């Protein structure tokens, strides 16, 4: 596979002004199945398999996330592979990674953006693609947790308490998540909360820029625009969830 990687790099790389194309999820799956050959700096990671023997994964609008494991340490990671181009994504994630590197909190996980990290044999003109590496968060989304525990008054009271503590902590930070919603909040097995999906995050280095998203409709202020991009953009969502 590495020979094919070198061959394609020499013979088929074309210069283009068009938006970068990305592989299909099925093509990423095939690449991850042979992770040791197709990953560069992360070649020591192996995919965690589901009950059907396939790489464990979940997908969203712009990416697919694989559960990977370092067999030397036993630690699991989330490897995010992109399926669509998003303008400014690389620089944004570099800035986010720099901001979060020294944040010591269970509410946030560190992120690492790696350019040209995964080789994928696909119909795209490129054959090497970026990935985002994050700690794997065990648990379930807050939306799922509420659906399963809404009749348990104690569980709901503790969830409300922990959410309000997280909200107070987040509002004291110089950054903002950018897309607060129950689907982007993980409830760990011990009940503690962790924010995931940082695509819309604001960090101080982005001051003066436009937001890449205005959040999710049901949890975003109706008057918010891409020009509203600072450390206060989570206020409406946090208040809406806290009061519901």
Which residues does each predicted region cover?
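Conserved end of the kinase activation segment
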Residues: 223-232
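Juxta-kinase regulatory segment immediately upstream of eukaryotic protein kinase catalytic domains
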Residues: 2-56, 91
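Conserved activation segment of eukaryotic-like protein kinases, specifically the C-terminal portion
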Residues: 208-223
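Catalytic-loop of the protein kinase fold
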Residues: 167, 171-183, 187-188
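Activation of the activation-loop gatekeeper triad in protein kinase-fold domains
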Residues: 197-202
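Conserved structural core of kinase catalytic domains
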Residues: 109-156
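ATP-binding glycine-rich loop module of kinase domains
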Residues: 53-55, 61-112
């Amino acid at each position: 596979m590495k020979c094919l990687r070198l061959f394609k790099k020499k013979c088929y790389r074309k210069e283009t002004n068009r938006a970068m194309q990305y592989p299909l999820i099925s093509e990423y799956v095939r690449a991850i199945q042979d992770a040791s050959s197709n990953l560069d700096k992360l070649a020591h990671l192996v995919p965690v398999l589901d009950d059907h023997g396939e790489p464990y994964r979940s997908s969203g609008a712009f990416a697919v996330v694989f559960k990977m494991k370092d067999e030397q340490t036993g630690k699991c990671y989330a490897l995010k592979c992109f399926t669509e181009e998003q303008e400014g994504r690389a620089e944004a994630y570099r800035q986010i990674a720099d901001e979060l590197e020294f944040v010591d909190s269970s509410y946030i996980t560190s992120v690492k953006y790696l350019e040209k990290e995964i080789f994928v044999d696909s119909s795209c003109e490129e054959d090497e693609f970026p990935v985002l590496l994050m700690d794997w968060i065990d648990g379930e989304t807050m939306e799922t947790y509420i659906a399963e525990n809404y009749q348990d008054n104690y569980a709901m009271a503790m969830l409300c308490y922990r959410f309000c503590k997280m909200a107070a902590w987040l509002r004291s930070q110089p950054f903002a998540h950018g897309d607060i919603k129950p689907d982007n909040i993980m409830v760990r097995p011990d009940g503690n909360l962790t924010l995931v999906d940082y695509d819309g995050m604001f960090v101080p280095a982005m001051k003066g820029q436009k937001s890449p998203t205005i959040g999710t409709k049901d949890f975003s202020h109706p008057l918010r625009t891409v020009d509203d991009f600072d450390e206060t953009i989570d206020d409406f969502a946090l208040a809406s969830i806290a009061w519901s």
